[in-house]
Amino acid sequence: MSSGKYRQQEIRAPRGTTLTAKSWLTEAPLRMLMNNLDPEVAENPNELVVYGGIGRAARNWECYDAIVDSLTHLESDETLLVQSGKPVGVFKTHENAPRVLIANSNLVPHWATWEHFNELDAKGLAMYGQMTAGSWIYIGSQGIVQGTYETFVEAGRQHYNGSLKGRWVLTAGLGGMGGAQPLAATLAGACSLNIECQQSRIDFRLRTRYVDEQADNLDDALARINKYTSQGKTVSIALCGNAADIVPELVARGVRPDLVTDQTSAHDPLHGYLPTGWSWEEYQQKAKTDPEGTVLAAKKSMAEHVRAMLAFSDMGVPTFDYGNNIRQMAKEIGVENAFDFPGFVPAYIRPLFCRGIGPFRWVALSGDPQDIYKTDAKVKEIVADDAHLHHWLDMARERINFQGLPARICWVGLEWRQKLGLAFNEMVRSGEVSAPIVIGRDHLDSGSVASPNRETEAMQDGSDAVSDWPLLNALLNTASGATWVSLHHGGGVGMGFSQHAGMVIVCDGTDEAAARIARVLHNDPATGVMRHADAGYDIAIDCAKEQGLNLPMIAATQGKH
């Protein structure tokens, strides 16, 4: 690693109501930055890595210290600018402006490659922010559990008459994102076999109850799968090994899963996908001494993995890419038909995006789990007639361990986000919860990302690669008064393949917060409805009309203003 990226230090966000910074609007980003590096949350906190290969919260430890110092002293009418994990300026703005504006990993398109980025990273000039690592709103694996759950449920509806009972999912990767898969499969009613090449990550998921058991070897894993599926039980099984070896072996044995996907860190071949025959230590060493050879070896292994996934697809097994760009990596190494199986968004999620539905999340800055349980109840009260959502909240409370500050993920859309945010703000005002709440989301949302191999794959108008939309989303959230706004490149699928934006808003119980919340939590999901309506999706056009959006080029929305 470059100098300054390693420091052995245990970081945990402050709890309670005593401020370190000058107001809750600066205390909130300070606590969430620290929470991203909590050892219960981050994958490799000593190197500032939160999740997703090398997704960091700050460029180096010197930058981290400077961010903390800046946030601690930031005034209520100042804005901190963060450039690829480095605090570069504090400017006078106004009290309703964002307190922090973040730009991470952005490169001019011609130079937007891993090779160029890695050169800059080695010089200390850049940082990979993933999506929520560098934007300080990562909440551990819970952040993707419901999205994965919704995907598996929809796959069961489409392929298995609405039930995954007695069926099993084959997948790989138990990192910060992939670690959600076993629990999501369990909650969706399926067993799962989860391949992971690092024992430490399996241990982490066992400890946090995201995975139930570990098998000793492939034969043992298959025996357990056969036993549990025949009994109609839902048990998740981890297997330590290399997916590029094990998935082809399953094809060779004629084993037939019921769903096949993958969430290894294939988006980053230099840091995130172990070549076959290599130990993890060897991989890390060769990444430094022979990066080109390492990338080639990783991509060759990905090619074998994808060929096996294609074989399952050819058998008629529902097979889909879960957004890690493994198909692209395989295609670059010669697997011309790598895109013969779809990504999860066009296959299962896009109708939700058309209504602005996506990963709404909130965090109790108090550190008190009771604050989250009270907000769970408030969501049920407000969204009273959504049995599916209520079921999710019940399962989340029962099965999901909080990592770091207590948090909740809950997929809701344009119709509800503003109402929920205002209700949470009122709970802070009345003292029903003990401290302010922050509301954010993944950058994987309906209007905040352009990613042709993931969120915007196979758009019906062909606009997959148009990245004006996340830029407009970030600009509108800034104008609307979000507490911090981020604009990133390369999250999820790697350099050159995505641009995306994030926002976080603080509910501190004030009238001023209520006004900001009303703007931000309407406008943010509305950009998703707008983006899909512009692409011609009837569901989005109908939603825009129902919600009174003013979209000048969409005739159905005119005449109501």
Curated annotation (Swiss-Prot):
Cofactor section: NAD(+)
Gene Ontology cellular component annotations, sorted alphabetically: cytoplasm
Binding site for NAD(+): 52-53, 130, 176-178, 196, 201, 242-243, 263-267, 273-274, 322, 492
Record keyword Cytoplasm present: yes
Annotated cofactor note: Binds 1 NAD(+) per subunit.
Main location class: cytoplasm
EC number(s) per entry: 4.2.1.49
GO molecular function (one): urocanate hydratase activity
InterPro entries, alphabetized: Urocanase (IPR055351), Urocanase-like (IPR023637), Urocanase_C (IPR035401), Urocanase_central_sf (IPR038364), Urocanase_CS (IPR023636), Urocanase_N (IPR035400), Urocanase_Rossmann-like (IPR035085), Urocanase_sf (IPR036190)
Localization terms from the record: Cytoplasm
The protein's role, per its UniProt record: Catalyzes the conversion of urocanate to 4-imidazolone-5-propionate.
Protein name: Urocanate hydratase
Source organism of the structure: Enterobacter sp. (strain 638)
